[in-house]
Curated annotation (Swiss-Prot):
InterPro entries cross-referenced by the UniProt entry: Exonuc_VII_L (IPR003753), Exonuc_VII_lsu_C (IPR020579), OB-fold_nuc-bd_dom (IPR025824)
Functional summary from the UniProt entry: Bidirectionally degrades single-stranded DNA into large acid-insoluble oligonucleotides, which are then degraded further into small acid-soluble oligonucleotides.
Catalysed reaction equations from the record: Exonucleolytic cleavage in either 5'- to 3'- or 3'- to 5'-direction to yield nucleoside 5'-phosphates
Taxonomic lineage: Bacteria, Pseudomonadati, Thermodesulfobacteriota, Desulfuromonadia, Geobacterales
MF-aspect GO terms: exodeoxyribonuclease VII activity; nucleic acid binding
Annotated protein name in UniProt: Exodeoxyribonuclease 7 large subunit
Top-level taxon in the UniProt lineage: Bacteria
Gene this protein is translated from: xseA
Length: 446
């Protein structure tokens, strides 16, 4: 009987692989809540973070295929509820949670995404009143961006036909919910701006859940409305529904029907507006006539006593005459002073005077230059004489004149200054002051 069973030795990789298999098999899907920390979002699109509570923590990873579906942006410190499976990162032997879905605690993911986008766009100024464009009073052509089969388009057309049947309506059908809806809505808004065939635009749909209305909360739609040169009226959902599009639009209507009522007045309202304008015009004309009659009466009263009017005019003429005389005297005095100043400057700047002064200066410069050159030449002569004397004293010719000669050894013509440099029989070249001679060495002595 064996005391111990046969040992099964595992490598570290095998051990981690076995643990991973056990965990993934028994924790295929779990829901975990906690606070997010150490969030990292590299360019790969994956999310890496730690989920923790007061007593423990676990590493989590959410791969790009899952993270790209998030409607909101996770942040450190945010409470989350996550769904995922437990696995092991074998190279480090660490267990982790592979997250497939997450949502914020206490508030839905879509609601949080709505709040985050609203705050960001508000900081950028997309909701500012200064950017809102006025809605035209009597539009001739109206563009509508909505579903071609929904109730919204029927409500809009019914109201427009009932209130003012002559207005033209251009419909740009789009998807208003589901994947790709936001892109279609934004493209339709830009198309209307590209062709500029309408005076005002209604963008909307009927009511629904937050998920149904979500296309109108997408950033791409908000920016298309903000960039539109054509006034935009948002008409999304019911009265209680607010979307990002409502905040960016130039005017918000609680329903599509209300949008049609806002953009086109009824015939009765137009008639009432015309009556009001007529009444205001009559009042303005009456005030204008009253002002004119007041002016006429004032002139009539003034003409009843012409001497009074002429007296005021004569007094004003006298005053103006005195002011003109004084102004002329001041002007003449200033002109005289300026003329005297210019005459003095002209005298000082007389070309003949300047030429004479220049001539005198030039003659003085020439005399000084001649004296200077004479002194320099004399110094140069003296220096040359001294140098010539020194050169003559040092010249070999002067030495030869005293009876000396220059001895060179043939054939290399090397100068001989010592008897040790020659041997009997050597040929020598002798140079005298005048001419020279060749000789042979017979004997030498020290």
């Amino acid at each position: 009987m064996e005391l111990f069973a046969e040992k099964r030795i595992l490598t570290v990789s095998q051990l981690n692989g076995l643990i991973r298999g056990v965990l993934e098999e028994n924790f295929e899907q779990v829901w975990v809540e906690g606070e997010i920390s150490n969030l990292a979002m590299p360019h790969s699109g994956h999310l890496y973070f730690t989920l923790k509570d007061a007593g423990a923590q676990v590493r989590c990873v959410m791969f790009r295929a899952s993270s790209r579906a998030l409607k909101f942006k996770p942040k450190d410190g945010m409470g989350l509820i996550v769904r995922g499976r437990v696995s092991v990162f074998e190279p480090r032997g660490e267990y982790q949670l592979i997250v497939e879905y997450l949502e914020p605690q206490g508030i839905g993911a879509l609601q949080l995404a709505f709040i985050q986008l609203k705050e960001r766009l508000a900081k950028e100024g997309l909701f500012a009143e200064t950017h809102k464009k006025p809605i035209p009073k009597l539009p001739q052509r109206i563009g509508v961006v909505t579903s071609a089969t929904g109730a919204a388009i029927h409500d809009i057309l019914n109201v427009l036909n009932r209130r003012f049947a002559n207005v033209q309506v251009l419909i740009r059908p789009v998807k208003v919910q589901g994947e790709g809806a936001a892109g279609e809505i934004a493209a339709a808004i830009r198309d209307f701006n590209r062709y500029r065939e309408i005076d005002v635009m209604i963008v909307g749909r009927g009511g629904g859940s937050l998920e149904d209305l979500w296309a109108f909360n997408e950033e791409v739609v908000a920016r298309a409305i903000y960039e539109s040169k054509i006034p935009v009226i948002s008409a999304v959902g019911h009265e209680i529904d607010f979307t990002i599009a409502d905040f960016v639009a130039d005017l918000r209507a609680p329903t599509p029907s209300a949008a049609a009522e806002l953009v086109v007045k009824s015939k009765a309202e137009l008639a009432s507006d015309l009556d009001a304008l007529s009444h205001r015009l009559v009042l303005a004309m009456r005030h204008c006539l009253e002002d004119c009659w007041g002016d006429v009466n004032g002139l009539t009263r003034a003409l009843k006593d012409p001497s009074l009017l002429l007296g005021h005019l004569a007094q004003r003429v006298d005053d103006l005459d005195e002011r003109i005389k004084h102004a002329v005297q001041v002007m003449l005095l200033r002109r005289k002073e300026k003329a005297a100043f210019l005459q003095n400057r002209l005298r000082l700047q007389n070309p003949a005077l300047q030429v004479e002064q220049g001539k005198e200066l030039l003659l003085g410069y020439c005399a000084r230059m001649e004296n200077t050159m004479e002194r320099l030449l004399e110094r140069a002569r003296q220096a040359a004489a001294v140098s010539a004397g020194k050169l003559h004293a040092l010249s070999p010719l002067a030495t030869l004149a005293r009876g000396y000669s220059i001895v060179r050894k043939l054939p290399d013509m090397s100068v001989i200054s010592d008897s040790s440099q020659v041997e009997p029989g050597d040929l020598l070249d002798l140079t005298f002051q005048q001419g020279g001679a060749h000789c042979r060495v017979e004997t030498k002595h020290d």
